[in-house]
A protein has these predicted regions:
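Conserved phosphate- and dinucleotide-binding cores of soluble alpha/beta proteins
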Residues: 11-12, 22, 45, 51, ...
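Residues at secondary-structure transition points
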Residues: 1, 5, 75-79, 83, ...
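Key DNA-contact positions within bacterial/archaeal DNA-binding proteins
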Residues: 23, 33-34
Length: 249
């Protein structure tokens, strides 16, 4: 077994068990004690697990309950967001009925969309304005306006989503976790994300690597409930997942 394959297997075992001993890994991977210890040292140095006496434990997830405002988020990881946004926009085909979630990466998508035969629904005023400026047909959800993320949220928005059946949808997330799925800091926004996902055939979450192994206050979908579009991913446990697309260009 190649080194990278062992790394991925070790991290996968840790994700499911939370902790593992050297002896268990020797059995699971059919590898020597020296090989396992060397692998654990390397993964610990990379910050992918925490090495303890006799084995390893899952590296503590980063928890976040704070929502940064849109202005501060727009310039974070902008190159990565542009790559992700361009690839995501290319998934939209003529005739698609698309849900576009509020967020800085979903907003960047709009500049790359070429199919004017697609119809859009969004909970972001800025997205609706830009889509209309570019000549797209767009519907804006009604409800409570959340100033921090500039999103329409709450029960009225959820009720408005009941009548829609989307072919494709694109969402942002504050946290992406194998165990806790996709999460966001605020309940009212999570409600809208959850309902729109439930009414969508193909779901895509747009997330740069900084969102991985992060957990926010409210989970709105399980990890397997969407395809993740990212770029520059270095985490083996996610790289081997069939629902993760790592954009190369």
């Amino acid at each position: 077994m190649l080194t990278e394959e062992r790394f991925a297997k070790i991290l996968s075992i840790l994700e499911s068990m939370g902790s593992v001993t050297v002896q268990q890994l020797m059995t699971e991977l059919n590898a020597s004690e020296s090989t396992i210890r060397r692998d654990l040292n390397a993964l610990d140095a990379n910050g992918q697990l925490t090495k303890v006496h006799g084995g390893a434990i899952l590296k503590t997830m980063a928890y976040s309950t704070k929502d940064d405002n849109v202005v501060s988020r727009k310039e974070k990881n902008r190159d990565a967001k542009n790559k992700i946004a361009k690839y995501a926009a290319e998934q939209i085909a003529p005739g698609d009925f698309v849900y576009l979630d509020a967020g800085t990466t979903t907003e960047l998508m709009i500049e790359y969309i070429t199919s004017h035969q697609a119809v859009f629904v969004t909970n972001a005023i800025s997205h609706a304005k830009r889509l209309a400026e570019r000549g797209f047909t767009v519907y804006l959800l009604g409800g409570e306006f959340k100033a921090v993320t500039e999103a329409i949220v709450g029960e009225e928005a959820v009720a408005a989503l009941e009548k829609y059946n989307f072919t494709k949808g694109f969402w942002g997330a504050n946290g992406v976790s194998l165990q806790k799925g996709y999460s966001t800091p605020e309940l009212k926004e999570a409600m809208v994300k959850k309902k729109s996902m439930e009414n969508c055939k193909e779901c895509f979450v747009l997330a740069d690597e900084s969102k991985f192994n992060q957990i926010s206050s409210v989970t709105f979908a399980p990890f397997e409930g969407a395809t993740v579009i990212t770029t520059g991913l270095s985490l083996p446990a996610y790289k081997k997942c069939n629902n993760v697309i790592d954009v190369k260009q």
